[in-house]
Amino acid sequence: MSMQDPIADMFTRIRNGLSAEKEVVSVPFSKMKMEIANFLVNEGYIKGCSKGTTLAGHPSIEIELKYHAGAPVIEMIKRVSRPSLRIYKSHEELPKVYGGFGVAIISTSKGLVSDRKARDLGVGGEIIGYVA
């Protein structure tokens, strides 16, 4: 049986890893998930990410989770647009996550950007998810 929403699965693995206080979580590899992981590194929500392989030889992404004073840096990570219901917004309609303290991950024609950067560039796109 195939996975219906790989990005939602990635977010769930990160959430579960944080609640179990894991240092590293592994997710199956895809270019989009690697882009999202690099985005989270650049925004400071995770320590790092690297491409690896599972014991079965399948490519995977190793995500190093980040904690501050014993508490997870990521308080909330949520999938918004999903395969059965895509959510697109123009740059004027982009939401502020947690009153501007969080970040919306937006897939635009300029690549994967934060909601702030999309507003600055004047581009809209698909809202992949929210992180705070």
Curated annotation (Swiss-Prot):
Entry's Gene Ontology cellular component terms: ribonucleoprotein complex; ribosome
Pfam families noted in UniProt: Ribosomal_S8
InterPro entries xrefs: Ribosomal_uS8, Ribosomal_uS8_CS, Ribosomal_uS8_sf
Biological process annotations from GO: translation
Superkingdom, natural source: Bacteria
GO MF annotation terms: rRNA binding; structural constituent of ribosome
Keywords: Ribonucleoprotein, Ribosomal protein, RNA-binding, rRNA-binding
Transmembrane segments: none
Record-linked PANTHER family: 40S RIBOSOMAL PROTEIN S15A
Function: One of the primary rRNA binding proteins, it binds directly to 16S rRNA central domain where it helps coordinate assembly of the platform of the 30S subunit.
Similarity comment text for this entry: Belongs to the universal ribosomal protein uS8 family.
Subunit structure: Part of the 30S ribosomal subunit. Contacts proteins S5 and S12.
Protein name: Small ribosomal subunit protein uS8
Source organism of this protein record: Francisella philomiragia subsp. philomiragia (strain ATCC 25017 / CCUG 19701 / FSC 153 / O#319-036)
Gene behind the chain: rpsH
